[in-house]
Amino acid sequence: MNTFVVVFLLLTAILCHAEHALDETARGCNRLNKKCNSDGDCCRYGERCISTGVNYYCRPDFGP
């Protein structure tokens, strides 16, 4: 019984990690605080590509 639980949790963790990786490559978007070139090609909905002085990063867009 204990072995079954360990194997089940291991498989669940592997599947969740694989699904997360596929989701990011399918979107072509970077996660929050990653470098970007423009709003359209890397930021998720509700984020903007904002300059931090040297580089640009996707940050939440709270309006104008």
UniProtKB/Swiss-Prot annotation:
Disulfide bonds: 29-43, 36-49, 42-58
GO CC entries: extracellular region
GO molecular function: calcium channel regulator activity; potassium channel regulator activity; toxin activity
Domain of life: Eukaryota
Record has DNA-binding as a keyword: no
Location(s) in or outside the cell: Secreted
Claim: Signal is one of the keywords in the record: yes
Tissue expression from the record: Expressed by the venom gland.
Propeptide boundaries: 19-27
Keywords, in A-Z order: Calcium channel impairing toxin, Disulfide bond, Ion channel impairing toxin, Knottin, Potassium channel impairing toxin, Ryanodine-sensitive calcium-release channel impairing toxin, Secreted, Signal, Toxin
Location (main, coarse): secreted
Signal peptide annotation: 1-18
The protein's role, per its UniProt record: May increase intracellular calcium release through the activation of nuclear inositol 1,4,5-trisphosphate receptors (ITPR) of cardiomyocytes, thereby causing an increase in the contraction frequency of these cells.
Family to which the UniProt record says this protein belongs: Belongs to the scorpion calcin-like family.
Domain characteristics, as noted in the entry: The presence of a 'disulfide through disulfide knot' structurally defines this protein as a knottin.
Name of the protein described by the UniProt record: Toxin BmCa-1
